[in-house]
């Protein structure tokens, strides 16, 4: 499940008291009326998935820039969030540029619409807190679209860590790199990409960040950063490392979790999970054994059922609105991730370690 994780001092959806669920809707016979604002690179995929998800009906779309991907179909392309609200919605999906997240989300909260906002929740943590508070005060489900939590490799990894198959977790490393995306213009690589790794690391490890230290660079001619390297520490002494950029001529999405029994390697491009076990047979070549520190053991590649992560994300949001289950990424979690993102940017600009 692309589920939330209970962290000390960080609210999750485990306690749903005060939330006004739509328990009589979200079925094939009585679907949720869904509005989508933002018909760009992500919005077009959300439109496709919403239409294919049982219990959801796409009834309205909006984008002031029009419908360049032709996803509206027979629906009129509305000019703004207020026209979208006037269509009569149960839920909404926000896929506009990050700079507009706060204004659009607050309008939807004011109208009483359960909403999922694409990551990050807002352009900064203060705005994110305002958004999260608006939904909480009105008893609405507010979710953030961290779709990597629904990746089959990371879901399987989380389940195996929870089962204790790795023993004590020592380290989480992520690599997320590829060519420059033409779709991004309002944020840098930290808020666009590294935010995924920050969220999934805390989720997989079940622990909060306590400190980060980072470096960024600007090589593509834009004001925002396009390359980042960061290290950090989680509660319990788990060390983390993130390598993220838009300057690599190939795509890579890898998460490596190392612990007392070996290492898990999750490839989120392919959805594959591999386990490299610590060996139990001692090496007779003393120099090699001393160099490796641990011996090489069995390598296991798991057979994992694979469904589209975006479909699982929409189903989780639908079920949260219905009150059936609580597996979505909460807005409180989205704010916590943005706190770490801002700490990364502060660390890079001030050349110091930032405590959280």
Where are the language model's segments positioned?
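Hydrophobic residues in well-ordered beta-strands that form the structural core
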Residues: 117-118, 142-144, 266
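Rossmann-like dinucleotide-binding domain that binds NAD(P)(H)
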Residues: 181-250, 254-256, 332
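N-terminal Rossmann-like dinucleotide-binding module
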Residues: 2-73
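C-terminal helix-rich "cap/oligomerization" subdomain common to oxidoreductases
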Residues: 1-28, 91-93, 316-356
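A contiguous active-site-proximal alpha/beta segment in oxidoreductase catalytic domains
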Residues: 122-184
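Beta-loop-alpha module in the N-terminal Rossmann-like domain of NAD(P)-dependent dehydrogenases
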Residues: 6, 20, 46, 75-133
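C-terminal glycine/acidic-rich active-site capping loop/insertion
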Residues: 147, 261-332, 356
């Amino acid at each position: 499940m692309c589920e939330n994780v209970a962290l000390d001092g960080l609210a999750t959806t485990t306690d749903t008291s005060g939330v006004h669920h739509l328990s009589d809707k979200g079925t094939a016979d009585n679907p949720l009326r869904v509005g989508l604002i933002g018909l760009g690179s992500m919005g077009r995929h959300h439109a496709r998935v919403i239409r294919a998800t049982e219990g959801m009906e796409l009834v309205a779309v909006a984008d002031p820039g029009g419908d360049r991907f032709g996803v509206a179909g027979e629906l009129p392309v509305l000019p703004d969030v207020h026209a979208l609200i006037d269509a009569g919605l149960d839920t909404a999906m926000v896929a506009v540029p990050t700079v507009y997240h706060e204004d659009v989300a607050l309008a939807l909260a004011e109208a009483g619409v359960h909403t999922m906002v694409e990551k990050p929740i807002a352009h900064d943590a203060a705005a994110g807190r305002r958004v999260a508070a608006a939904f909480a005060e009105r008893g609405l489900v507010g979710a953030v679209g961290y779709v990597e939590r629904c990746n089959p490799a990371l879901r399987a990894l989380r389940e195996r860590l929870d089962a204790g198959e790795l023993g004590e977790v020592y380290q989480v490393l992520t690599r997320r790199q590829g060519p420059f995306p033409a779709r991004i213009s309002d944020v840098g690589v930290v808020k666009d990409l590294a935010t995924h790794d920050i969220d999934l690391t805390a989720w997989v490890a079940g622990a909060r960040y306590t400190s980060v230290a980072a470096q960024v660079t600007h090589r593509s001619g834009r004001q925002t950063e396009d390359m980042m390297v960061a290290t950090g520490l989680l509660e319990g002494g788990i060390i983390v490392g993130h390598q993220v950029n838009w300057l690599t001529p190939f795509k890579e999405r890898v998460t490596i979790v190392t612990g007392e029994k070996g290492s898990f390697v999750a490839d989120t491009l392919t959805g594959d999970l591999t386990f490299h076990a610590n060996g139990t047979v001692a090496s007779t070549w003393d120099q090699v054994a001393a160099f490796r520190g641990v011996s090489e053991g069995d390598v296991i590649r798991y057979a994992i059922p694979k469904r589209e992560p975006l479909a699982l994300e929409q189903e989780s949001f639908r079920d949260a609105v219905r009150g059936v289950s609580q597996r979505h990424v909460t807005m409180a979690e989205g704010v916590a991730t943005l706190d770490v993102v801002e700490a990364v940017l502060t660390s890079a600009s001030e050349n110091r370690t930032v405590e959280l």
